[in-house]
Amino acid sequence: MATLLRSKLTNVATSVSNKSQAKVSGMFARMGFQAATDEEAVGFAHCDDLDFEHRQGLQMDILKSEGEPCGDEGAEAPVEGDIHYQRGGAPLPPSGSKDQAVGAGGEFGGHDKPKITAWEAGWNVTNAIQGMFVLGLPYAILHGGYLGLFLIIFAAVVCCYTGKILIACLYEENEDGEVVRVRDSYVAIANACCAPRFPTLGGRVVNVAQIIELVMTCILYVVVSGNLMYNSFPGLPVSQKSWSIIATAVLLPCAFLKNLKAVSKFSLLCTLAHFVINILVIAYCLSRARDWAWEKVKFYIDVKKFPISIGIIVFSYTSQIFLPSLEGNMQQPSEFHCMMNWTHIAACVLKGLFALVAYLTWADETKEVITDNLPGSIRAVVNLFLVAKALLSYPLPFFAAVEVLEKSLFQEGSRAFFPACYGGDGRLKSWGLTLRCALVVFTLLMAIYVPHFALLMGLTGSLTGAGLCFLLPSLFHLRLLWRKLLWHQVFFDVAIFVIGGICSVSGFVHSLEGLIEAYRTNAED
């Protein structure tokens, strides 16, 4: 009797478990995620075993056919889709293809372009996240206090994590259990997430966001160059707009850039200039340590202006749009995680110290660009280094923006909107060079008409920075790797998506209000 009762209870429990699994699987299937039950997993494993045996037989047939005389022209050639099998049904491109996934250089690189070391990749990432935008961090502390300092650390941790999971989305396990690179860019990841219903929608959204982010970064470099030169030499009869024009004239040779190798050399010089700037500013602040205003660092926040600070902090860490290209161009991609760790740790420490020390020195008088607070003699020297850093930082986002535009609009193929920018010999066509120069001039025009550094940085960070660094990587990670994620990884991804969405909306609204208010003030003056 006890055995019969135990058997019935076991059957009921099994039935309830199967029904609950079916409901959960159906719910996630409707959301677009791939959840597999135990029975489905067994089925997948069985299919993989059968497929492995089938491909082993094909390989034996191919070896036998290679050993036979070449005169047997009547033999049927093996089907390409059988040889180049890939989970998901998509065949791998033939070797030498421009779009080959494994080992591809990504959006901003290619097969025939020189590879970079982990150190060179690190200089590029450091240049992106430890760039000119550190000058706005003391302004973020002004409106955020200790919470602003916490956000500098929190943003470093989150951006390092999302950078790693974004690269993880480039890889999948093949039928033999080997991890291979099946995608080559941020756009390819987005397209894979939207397939099969909207196979190109995700790529277009990411392309637009990337172009906005990169072009706005270039604009900010021109804005800060004009601002710094104008404040360094106020006695000269040269306006800020005129200084911006001079800076743009120096940047025109960027139109001739061809690969990331040259950009990496600029990034190295730029990083060295940045360390000199940090040392000079921090040394001056330490000389006034006895006057530091610790009581001015608040535990409360300015509700209206703090969202702008969030955008500034987030934008200062944006590097995700470069990462697929950098990882694809690395000589040793296995060193990518280590490179991300030390670059973000260094950036977090330097940014936190710089922002706190600078704010303690000037407190409520802290300006949008912190070097404007320096006395005239020191300001001129520091600003010259900063201008050099801005001009050396410009090539990386400009080169990336050009590559995105060329790949999405001008690449040869049936889906290209315009003819290719390169000739058959690989040389840049004259009209392609003209378009590159036009992009440089466009950044100048925007810098002249929107010369508000901190507000523009907060707006861009809230609009595209949060999307590309927080929202999309976590969403793509859930969508593509759902079946392999542990519960804490799912929790992190969902939390990052929710927090990033809230910060993005609030920061965008308040930055836009700040720009409108700034224009009204200028109009009244």
Swiss-Prot record:
Catalytic activity reads: 4-aminobutanoate(out) + n H(+)(in) = 4-aminobutanoate(in) + n H(+)(out); glycine(out) + n H(+)(in) = glycine(in) + n H(+)(out); beta-alanine(out) + n H(+)(in) = beta-alanine(in) + n H(+)(out)
Q: Where in the cell is it found?
A: Cytoplasmic vesicle membrane; Presynapse
The organism's superkingdom is given as Eukaryota
Give the UniProt tissue specificity note: Brain and retina. Localized in horizontal cell tips at both rod and cone terminals.
The name on file for this protein is Vesicular inhibitory amino acid transporter
A Gene Ontology term for the protein's cellular component: neuron projection terminus
Q: Which organism is it from?
A: Mus musculus (Mouse)
Check the record and name the InterPro entries matching this protein.
Answer: AA_transpt_TM
Q: What does this protein do?
A: Antiporter that exchanges vesicular protons for cytosolic 4-aminobutanoate or to a lesser extend glycine, thus allowing their secretion from nerve terminals. The transport is equally dependent on the chemical and electrical components of the proton gradient. May also transport beta-alanine. Acidification of GABAergic synaptic vesicles is a prerequisite for 4-aminobutanoate uptake.
**Family assignment?**
Belongs to the amino acid/polyamine transporter 2 family.
Cytoplasmic topology ranges: 1-132, 226-265, 327-341, 405-438, 483-489
Q: Which residues cross the membrane?
A: 133-153, 205-225, 266-286, 306-326, 342-362, 384-404, 439-459, 462-482, 490-510
Instruction: Recite the UniProt keywords alphabetically.
Output: Cell projection, Cytoplasmic vesicle, Membrane, Neurotransmitter transport, Nitration, Synapse, Transmembrane, Transmembrane helix, Transport
Q: Which gene encodes it?
A: Slc32a1
Pfam families (UniProt xref): Aa_trans
